[in-house]
Amino acid sequence: PNLELHDLMRQFTRQIVQGKSKDFDASQIILVCGAERSGKTLLSKKLAKFLPTHTAAQNSTLILQNNRVIADPLSGDLNSLFKSSSDANVTSLFRKRQDIALDGSRLIVDYEGPMDLLNSVLMRLETLEHKPQVSVIYTLEVGKSYDAVRQALEVLQIPNLSVALTKMDLLEVSISELSAVFDLGTKIQFFSGLKTLEDGLDFAKISVVEDFLLDIVRQDGL
């Protein structure tokens, strides 16, 4: 392709690929949300298995904590779960769950609640005195139209939300889908489905998306 077209593709790619994020790296809680059967449960497991864990000090020894996964709607009696008093902390949110302890591990939430309640969940997390660093990942199954992708992402309206493209072992992402992500100013952070859970987690890379676009350009003879 000519240099001008190559530069345009590079600019386009840089707008839609998240790249390394210090905020995400520091996250204590990662909420994974998405449509039913969009691959969010598998992605939650991948994140827990392959993301680095924080370390916790115990008797002057650094203990590596395993990341935890819970599947939870975070709904019901939310007012009793979220505390704003001086003793508020992340563990009070899940105090009925014996398997939860944020003592160095990350908590990956496979979010099972309605999407229209997710903003409420995030707002209440912000009211905790010991504010946890929270990231939100939306699992977007590839193989959809421009309008379907735009509609799915538009209704969320969650700041700093990033996307994981899922089921990429079954279908190839289209330029229409990438264009919808671009038009909404959303960033892609993960590719899921290119490898099995045992093989690893794919962070979205600018070079990978550029190569994909270049292949399409070559096929079209541009």
What are the language-model segments listed below?
Residues 22-24, 53-56, 85, 98-104, ...:
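Conserved catalytic network of the ASCE P-loop NTPase/AAA+ motor domain
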Residues 133-140, 157-198:
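Conserved beta-strand/loop subsegment of P-loop NTPase cores
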Residues 115-122, 147-151, 173-176:
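Conserved ATPase-coupling elements of RecA-like P-loop NTPase cores
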Residues 33-38, 63-124, 128-130, 138-142:
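Switch II (G3) loop of P-loop NTPases
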Residues 49-63, 69-70:
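Post-Walker A helix-loop "phosphate-sensing" segment adjacent to the P-loop in P-loop NTPases
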Residues 29-53:
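Glycine-rich phosphate-binding P-loop
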Residues 1-27:
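Extreme N-terminal, non-catalytic leader segments
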Residues 1, 181-222:
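NTP-binding/hydrolysis catalytic cores, primarily Walker-type P-loop NTPases
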